[in-house]
Amino acid sequence: MSTKQSPALQLAEGQLTKLTSESEEIRMRALDQIETRFIRCLQLGEPIQFKPVLLLKQLIRWFGYTPPLVPDRVLAMIMELLRSEYAEAVIRKIPYERFKAELQKVRRVLHKQESKRVSELLDDMNLLLLEKYNIDRVTPSVSSLSSNDIPSQATESADSSSNQIYDNLKPEDYEPSWSHPCLDDVATMKSMIDLPRNSVELQLQLTELIIRMGDYPTEYFLQPPFVFLHLVQLQTMTDGSLIHVNRALIACLRLLQQRILLRRNTLSYADRFDPPSRPKQVKVVSALVILLENCMKLIRPLLFSCTNDNWHIMELIVEIVRTHDVLSSKIPLVSITLIADAVKSLLAYCNSVEGSCMTQLMDSLRIPRLQSLILNGVLHDMVALNINYDKRMDRRQAKALIQPIVLDSAYLSGMPERMKSLNTLISSLDSGPSPDEELIKLKRAYSVALNQLHPNTELTGSLLIQKYRQVCLVLVQLGSETLVKQLFGAVVKCIPFYAGNLKLRKDADELLYTLVDLPALKLRSLIYRLMIKSTVAHFHSFMNKTVYMTGCSNVDLIRQHILGVPLTPLLLRRMIIQSSEANTSERMQQWCLDYPIMIMKLNAILAPQDFSVVFPLLLPVLPLLISRSVTHKILHNVIWNVLEPDSSRLDPQLMLRGYVYFMFHPDGEVRSEATTTIAYVLQCQEQTNRYLPTASNVPVEHIANDLCIIQPPFCYRSIFIKCSDERFQGQRSLDALFRLLQAKDIKSNIRKSTMTQLNVLLRNWRACEEFSTKEDGYRLIMESLHNALKKGNDTDILLPTVSILMKLLFNDDEFRLEVANTFGVYTLLLRALFLFPHLEQLRQDVSICLFQMLFQNCITSTEDKLVLNANMEPLILPVTYEIEHKVIPTAVTEGLELQQNVEATHFGRDRAKAAQHWRLYMAYRVCQVPSSITLESVSALDIRESLKIKMADLALVRSSDLNEQLSCQFIAAENCSKHEDLQKTVSAIQLFLVVLRNSLSDTVAENLWKLIHKYIRLAPGNEADDKVYKSMLDLCVTCIRFSQPHAINGLSYALETDHHHSFQLLLHDSQISLDKLFLICQCMMQLLSNELSDDSMNWYGKFFMQLSAVAKTHFELRQLQHVRCILCMLRFVSERNLKFSNAQLMSYSQHFIQLSSNLRTSTQTGSEWQRDCLYIICQLQIHLIYQEPKASSKASIPNDVGASYKVLRYFLTLCGHGDSEVRALSWVSLANWITICGSQVAEILPRLDFLPGGLPACCLTTLTDAHEMMLIRELAGRVFILLMPLIGAESSLELLRKHDLLKTAYNSLKAIHDTPWMFKKIVGERHSCEVISCYVAICTKMVAMKPEWCAALCGHSLMSGLSDVMKKLKSQASCSIPLVELCASQICELYSMCYTNNFEFLKMTICRDSVFLQNYLTLINDVLSLECPEYMVIPLLKMFLIFCTDSNSNSFLIEQIKNKPSLFMDFFLFGLHVKLINSPFQRFTLSALSLVFTKAQLAAYDISMLSELEKFELAFSDPDIAKDGKQEFESKKKQSVSQCIYDESSDNSDDNKQRPNHAIQATNAAIIIFHRLDQLFDRYYLSKALNFLELPAVGQVQVCEALGELLKASTWAVKAAGESKLLGKVVHILDDFLNDEKIGNAAVYVKRVGPHKAQSIISNLLVLINMLSQWHSSPNSEIIQTSMAANIAKILIRIWPWLSHSYHLKKVTVQLIMFLTEHSFEMCKQISLLQSGHAQSLLHLMARVADFETTKKEIPNKEPSLNMVPALRVMVNCCCCTEGRLSLSKMNLLDMFDTILPANPCSTHLKVRPPVLIAWLGFWEVFSRYDVGGKACHLQSLINTIRRSPPLSHKRILCLRILRNMCFFNGNRPRLVELADFINLLRDILEQRVQKAPTSEKNGLNSFEEHRLAVLMLWKLFGFGAKYKGMLRGTKLFKLLIGLRVEMSVVFSEEENKYAGVPYANDLAKLLEKLMESMRQ
């Protein structure tokens, strides 16, 4: 990069004068030169030196020469001059009138040329002059577009459209601008939309507009000069440029979407300080509405045809909806309505197409249907968006809008994902019952019914009966006789099951009634035919005594009311009613009556008791049968025969009831016979003598036959008076009358008066209702009726009683039913009728009562009318009535009603539309897959013809199968013979892709790529080929943008393998047209951003180099837009693995720095250029930083400090650019360059003195600037952190103080914005979590550089503020990632930095803050839920180590682990994954676990984390399989521990706790942790990479340490280790090492390579031995297998030579042997044995260690070395086995006491320190317990030692115990007895005084231990054998023993607790008794 500014270009005066040269050639050459320089400078924004007035004059004078050459170019230069910044000079010098006059002259000169372009330029120039001279200016909004006026011929509509757009904009369509451009950017944008009038140039200019659009924030286009609206205006042009305008609009919308998302991001926020009156912009929603309206105007004429513009318009509509979604804004109803109207129009067309030729139908439907599908999806998305964003949406209206989509079966079936989404949408729109539920119900019914017509899905028997309602819903609609037969067959087939399944019987009854009641006569006739067949068969089986149904008795069936089919009164009633209907055929009418006749004829076949079961079936329909019998003689005879008293098998009650019906018969003879029979029955009744005689006056045969014939019938309305709406007023009267009725002893006349008054009162309907509420009301009336007919009673009350009964029966239907089934009431009423036939009123009332009782199930009575549900004519009924046929709803009627409702609500009662919908639905249900639908597959079904699919329907289905139609387009493309046809086909394919996106089938996608590749592989050869090539490029861009794998992989492979591909050739063509280059670049960018796999080949590097060269070429040719296209590609290529050397990376970095500098501006114009260059630079820098190997990168650092300074200076200048993204990339580049330069930066920083305070101060200033974008503030902070080590701690601290950073950071915490998205309205300044992170990171860095500063930091309020931030974490709702990262990565890291020097601060603050600790656990949970949280978990682990160190916080964690064990397990296990091996994350995890295990060893078992984890049960999967770093274990109880441990209702006793000796029912957490550690151990040690010659890795050491500590602390882990054979693996590893021939013998190896090189082996051995030592220090780690013990012993012996080279290894190994023998008897045996191939056993080596460590000389005044203690302990342990004792005896170890415990010590003897001597005495004490070690020796030394040692000292006690042990062996008795010093010693011991109480003598002992040992020795020596007893009796010693015994006995007898607190007192007393007893024997 050159640091010098290039000199400004100039147009010399002499050069300008050449414009008026006489030579035409000179004039033209001068014009070319001036035009090139002038225009280029204007485009690049570079200054140019010239005289504007002179240039203008010369250009005007140009037209003085005839003929005028290239007038359009000269006028264009004048226009550019007037628009440029140089126009001011012209305006000042030349008045408006003069300028206008000169232009008039030019117009006259050019008048003859008739050039459209020239006239347009002159018109525009006139308008421009008005603006420049402020002459008659128009409003800003109009002027912004009027300056870009379009010629009148082509764009009169455009002008009107432009004006209309602005006229329609209202104040509410504007909003405050998000940001606003500077004047230079406004001028540039004006020039961008100052489009030429030539269509070719216009298209080129639009392409440039798309390329340059990225320079500006998209909101600029919604502000003057309103670029967006100008593009909308250009859509109305008719010059063929619509496709380019739409492409620009699509690009603008996508940029707008990106801008909206960017503005929502917190990192893009900066505190605004704009005034409230800042500029306005058109609202995005308003702009989208304008665009959508314009698009719909354009697409309406094209809905039924396909042009090159269709797909762009449709894509625009889709992008509009997507922009609304990104904006989170509702879509205005006007926009939705526009789409809905188009959807309706297209659907109406598609549904109306008719024809019989499939080809013609498909041609008519293909494009309209395709666009219909697109708009269906758009409408669907619009309504779905409004549900989310419009809370006040009219859901009913929204549902009406999408109703056409819901009914588009072809659309939903072809797009199942849309169907699912639409169902969800409809359910969300339905707040209550929805008409769509009816449609869904019908469709489900059709589906079930159609399944019945398919053999594979047909239901039979009970299953079909259970589903009958769904089938019957559509039975009539389908008109299928097959379904009717299946349903009836199911009813008959299930007859055997009805007895045991009442629900099935009920369903069968309902089904049969539904079938009988079918409205379709054809289907009903079929049912009757089937019923006749079944019923006759059953009846004949009675006659022939055969079986009707296998397994069922005929009589049993009839008892179940089954005669051929199940029967119910309702079914019979319906059949009888149908027998009288006019539309029923005569045959069917006859059959309807034959059925009950057949049932009644069973009277002659069945037993009486069986017929009595059958007759109740007929009783409810008996009124109807008798009514029909009037005109049906056979029926009359059958009924009469059944009721005949002499032959009837019925009960008399039923028989009497039947004859009463005939009293209403129109035939007098029938009535007479019935009356006579009734009278006869009444006379023959029992207890007849109790009542008044019925025939006392008239003989029976002379009784009138018209007793119940009331002519005319009594008017029902006169029974009850009309009541008002008021409440019943006669309540008191009714109560009084009722009380009188209840009285028993009232007179008859009073009772009659009472009944009469009550009768009158009950004419009120409400009074009847009140009377019905009386408890005994009905009973009193019935008693009155009964008493009135008794003999001897007054009959005066009979008439009012019957009248009251009549009214009450009408009023209460329940009472009526009860009375109708009471036989006594019939007899009472008939007696009254026969007693007083002459009383008309009584006869009338009785007749009406009988009518009510007989017809009770047929009548419904109200206050003003009586209704019968069937026509009872010709019976003569006694009261007037109305007939209302009661329709019982069935599934069929419900289905028909549903069908009508759906037709009304969904199809607007358009039957044709509804029929088509159901035809399509039937076809889809039958054929399942749209592609398999054929006319033949549906025509074979037994359904109505109107429901079978037609040819037009099939065409609609096929046109909806987009993959199939797209395949047809490929065929059409192959058959194209013209370029235009091919282009049209490609446009159609693009239209298909608008809706299909990336959901193409593999075959279609592959064919699509083949088509594209065929035409883009070679470069076009002519103009026609060029157009096809561009259309194919456009198609290729679409495919790759939709991420179609075939296109992506295909193009990638083609570019990699085909070096002559058109892309390769055209990209290197410097003359390539801009539009073609732009399309190629779009292809490449989409490819690079969507490529599925990153090839390992070097294709990207080569491509990068080629593109860089091409960009350079274009730049040299000043083809700047070409360069922009290339830079966009390079941006993506730079992200790939370029495989460049460091030198290449540095070279290209400098190249792009120079390229960036060549077009540097401070405004938005050209910012995309800068972004691309800087992004490429950043990527190259990243490659350079992370290049391998690292050392080579240092060589690429530029040695020239000056060059690095220039680069840094350049980046710093761009840090002040107007574009925020440029600034951000500049800071990133700056940081990367600082990293690359390393130490050079320290030399450069002082030279950056042009920055106030230098670069670090500039970084801090930017960081604290609230008006800067958050991202840039963060980047500046990161750069400062990079610079801190370079400027030093003191300078950094000084800067922090100067900027008061701690205070600023604390204040920023108050306004922290803790979400990643910004609110819609921000009040006051905000600070992102990332900015806060920078503040915290600076503090952390400062503490690391200057630890003593941490104290000052801890005293600042910032630390408490950070604690409060941590407390903001919510345990329930998931927090934002930036907040989690701030807390986990920065705040926790800062707190952990305070541990070293300021732990007390942490203990006093966060360790005691329970809220902080609780949020710390919440933070762990949030971090673990992220995808890549490794870098965030490390600070959390550091904090965990701190909390474990503090007792208070450690207790809190232990308590929390009880409630959240799974959280802690996730925390621990995540870092133990093998993928994280050797990572810092894993190392900290292992450290944390080691601390947990260590604390478990120190703490009580019940109060440690490990103990709680052992209680936590979980299911554990294979530990070797894990995905993405997550552990595959599943907690049995989420956030809870095992139920058997923590169930609140369970007992907390020991029985409920887990114990190691219990069977493991579930894997606990300790075992899981062990498995993870074991897996890591295997990864370290069982891999081929293991080498003992290399130092062990840190992780390797930590894993072994953690394993050892876990196995020491956990019994469960020990068991798991046994199962996984961990010990065997360790032994195998050590064995392999010892067998390694490369190493061999230890001494030889060390001698060969030197001691320093053997340290790696020592270290590896130390790691394993230390793990084993920790492990086996636990008493639970017992080795019981002999083979394992032997192997370990052999390994330890073989390792022994290495111990001489490491004192620490020797110490640890001896300790391991000590622990092994401590807990394992087998180990003691194997250590004692001599192993094969070895001269000494391991026990011998231990003895040598003990001997060496004892006898070696030690430095005076130094702590004694106790390394012999473990060795002696091994010797002690081995004493337990015979082998060990034998080996020890052979070593003569007791000879050591000659050295360490001489009998007569002198100065020449070895001085042994007391601890060493005690250790040896301890060994001797144990060894002397056995015969091989109990030999009496060194007696004098022991005695002397005892005498020299103070009483009760450890050494003295050990010596006494050794003597005691010697006394136990008889071989030592003679010598000991004869040893006077020994006896005297015992006497002296017994003479010692012992304190008996606290006040006893002060010099006394506090224990009887020595006395006990002395007495024990005396007992063993003298208590056995007369000789020895006699020797003792003659000594003073015996007297001492007696005195001691007496003293002890007296003391214990007088005061039991005298020696209770003195040790060994009781033991001594017992031994004295035993001794004395022995002496007495």
From Swiss-Prot:
A Pfam family assignment: RTTN_N
Cysteine pairings via disulfide bonds: none
Protein localization: Cytoplasm, Cytoskeleton, Microtubule organizing center, Centrosome, Centriole
Region (Disordered): 141-166
Principal location: cytoplasm
Example of a GO biological process term: centrosome cycle
UniProt key word ATP-binding: no
Function: Participes in the structural integrity of both centrioles and basal bodies and in centriole cohesion. Participates in the later stages of centriole assembly through the interaction with Rcd4 leading to the centriole to centrosome conversion.
Subunit composition and interactions: Interacts with Rcd4;this complex is recruited to daughter centrioles before their conversion to centrosomes.
Name assigned to this protein: Protein rotatin homolog
Species of provenance: Drosophila melanogaster (Fruit fly)
